[in-house]
A protein has these predicted regions:
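Short hydrophobic "helix-edge" motifs at membrane interfaces and signal-peptide entry regions
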Residues: 21-22, 122-124, 211
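Active-site segments that bind and position negatively charged phosphate/pyrophosphate groups
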Residues: 67-179
Length: 236
């Protein structure tokens, strides 16, 4: 990616820290054929992770009334981390599956690598994360989820649904829920080998970090739990 942000984990997979370097990589080389030849699950998970940048960045920005120019620019272009992926995601996966890179795959790759990197560098640490990644970090303490090897972006895709429910973005939730089903992303706890009984530990971990320190309102454990329960009902 084009970002200067690094994520460091403990050996057991739980989050250790965020690390911002002085500058990102000087050169980024993208070969769409190489990506098309790679296992599609990595592109698939990358789409889920990238989409969170838009929802987290724009929601976090509502919690800061004094955004500077570069941060405001990052917020404005963050839609490029989600809109093209929703438009081209299913087709891009098919191109990857068939090892035939085309426009859809190229647009998605640019969203994952370039758009997200630019936004990340512009907005700084406080707007680089949010509730979806807070919940992802929460699920790192769920042993069953970890044991089944679910990918980072796969879990983040589910956590976007939590964010949208907590933030009462109902129309956007409906759209992304349908997109998630079409993409094969998780839409219920069982899809990531978790249960409602795991949520106390997950939520405690989720709210213990810095991910929602710049948010337009206080996120409470009940907000997250209620959101998960609502999503479970939709999935029935």
């Amino acid at each position: 990616s084009c970002t200067s942000l690094g994520i460091i984990y403990h050996p057991d997979g739980s989050l250790r820290e965020y690390s911002f370097q002085e500058k990102p990589s000087e050169w980024i080389f993208i070969n769409t054929q190489v990506i098309a030849n790679a296992p599609e699950k990595y592109l698939w998970a990358g789409i889920g992770d990238t989409m969170a940048k838009f929802y987290e960045c724009t929601t976090s920005a509502r919690g800061d009334n004094d955004l500077d120019h570069s941060t405001s620019m990052g917020v404005q272009i963050s839609n490029l981390c989600a809109r093209p992926l929703v438009k081209y995601g299913v087709e891009a996966l098919e191109e990857c599956r068939n090892h035939t890179p085309g426009k859809a795959l190229e647009e998605v790759i640019l969203g994952i690598i370039v758009s997200t990197g630019f936004v990340s560098n512009l907005v700084g640490i406080d707007l680089n994360t949010g509730l979806a990644h807070a919940c992802y970090n929460g699920f790192t303490v769920c042993k069953s989820t970890e044991e089944h090897g679910h990918l980072h972006g796969e879990i983040v895709a589910y956590c976007i649904l939590i964010l949208l429910k907590v933030d009462h973005q109902e129309e956007e939730f409906k759209k992304i829920y349908e997109f998630s089903k079409n993409m094969g992303f998780p839409v219920k706890l069982a899809d990531i080998h978790a249960t409602i009984d795991d949520m106390d530990a997950v939520i405690t971990k989720a709210l213990s970090g810095i991910d929602v320190r710049v948010w337009p309102y206080e996120v409470t454990p009940d907000m997250i739990l209620d959101a998960v329960k609502e999503i479970e009902q939709v999935a029935l």
